[in-house]
Amino acid sequence: MPTTTEQPRSMWDHYTVTIQFVGPLAAAIPKHPKAILAMLEHRQPARVPKNATPLPELAEQVAEEVGADEEAPVGYATFKSDEEGPYYEGRCIRGHLKDCALQVASFFPETKNFRAKFVNRVYVQTDKIPLFNRYGKERIKTFSGPELRFIQVMTAQGPRSSLKQVDYIDSPRIQFTLAVLADGVIGEEHLRRV
């Protein structure tokens, strides 16, 4: 067998992505323990895997990550935080990328089933994405403030209105790493459009 000094090509291309938000980034995770459990129940798959974490245990974990408070209004939303400050989750970025891939699919008519190909080739490598100030130099330690939002929903009993309190961070910057399968189907131009 011949020997070579050439390094094998990696299966993955890695990209560092920086996003500068213009305006507030609003939180989406409930702060009240009962609302956390209700959110998890709503998002639970129809077929729960045998080795899945039980919902009460998962709700307790999320409650700890958001600093849940029984006194918080049921409609209060906040961010997960660790000892260094609030953070965004990689799984949320992946969800945004999936939605965006659907929206820009028509830009790439030569790539059949663009969204499916994108979703199966692009992975967010960073689980906890810290939030930095707009200059990217300082980690954000606290929220910019809460905002009251008037919301309306249609229910079986008719339209309903309520107030929702949402923590927000003004114009944060985030940075994370994407791993893209290096098979030539999804490249930098696709990533820039998405």
Over which residues does each language-model region extend?
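RNA-interacting cores
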Residues: 1-194
